Amino acid sequence: MKNTVIALLALLASAGSLAATPWQKITQPIGGSAQSIGAFSNGCIVGAEALPLSAPGYQVMRTDQRRYFGHPDLVQFIQRLSNQVHNKGMGTVLIGDMGMPAGGRFNGGHASHQTGLDVDIFLQLPQTRWTSSQLLKPQALDLVASDGKHVVPSLWSPQISQLIKLAAEDSEVTRIFVNPAIKQQLCLDAGSDRQWLRKVRPWFQHRAHMHVRLRCPAGSLECEDQAPPPPGDGCGAELQSWFEPPKPGSTPPVKKTPPPLPPSCQALLDEHVL
């Protein structure tokens, strides 16, 4: 996992330097009623909407990458969440990657974000709106200590817990991925109101942002939902297992070959990519 802001920014920069995928050649949404197709890590979208690039409650980062498209449900979720944050005077929500105009596989940085139902949101809430140069080259705030087991106390705030909780309490949200150390801090902060913690899942990296995932929309018949998270708040043995050293003799997982596209997504590529 990355341990510094510099490393986080290097990861973002490297994603843009890799060879383009066919999906990046589709520069506008595919016309039609909104349909998320396939799985979050192997799919596409018809009828995506562009998130308006600025609103009173949020700003969109790295707009030059054109990753601000998603299912209308995702656009509406971002607007709901940012309105809540704005009305509470918590600051400005910083929106990172959503998806490309037709969804599909990125050239780097993400395995998912393919069906228009995922969004990355920075875990910082500036009181002063960022300038255009700050938005194009955002400074990620690494909240995780160098030991990987705790958050940095001077960087953590109750507002970050509240931001994640507001997102988790939205009925359209099924999962929120954060670093295990961030999940652990949320468990400590939560008090007796813990039902929302079930949706917050520990995952690699995610030291400066949360990755929010929505459920498959009712009208998207070819969309594949994940199984629900396990029962409970996820603050027990499962979470602690993330902090254990690797078992002797364990080897890193082998990178898998991407599976074939869903037929409907392959048909979109065949029709729209020369």
Swiss-Prot record:
One of its GO terms (biological process) is proteolysis. GO terms for molecular function: metal ion binding; metalloendopeptidase activity; serine-type endopeptidase activity. Residues 1-19 form the signal peptide. Residues 224-263 are annotated as: Disordered. GO terms for cellular component: outer membrane-bounded periplasmic space. Zn(2+) 1 binds at H110, H113, D120, H211. InterPro entries: Hedgehog_sig/DD-Pept_Zn-bd_sf, Peptidase_M74. SUPFAM superfamilies: Hedgehog/DD-peptidase. It is found in: Periplasm. The keyword Magnesium does not apply. Binds 2 Zn(2+) ions per subunit. Zn(2+) ion 1 is bound in the active site. Zn(2+) ion 2 is bound at the dimer interface by residues from both subunits. It comes from the Bacteria. Keywords: Disulfide bond, Hydrolase, Metal-binding, Metalloprotease, Periplasm, Protease, Signal, Zinc. Dimer. Murein endopeptidase that cleaves the D-alanyl-meso-2,6-diamino-pimelyl amide bond that connects peptidoglycan strands. Likely plays a role in the removal of murein from the sacculus. This is Penicillin-insensitive murein endopeptidase. It comes from Klebsiella pneumoniae subsp. pneumoniae (strain ATCC 700721 / MGH 78578).
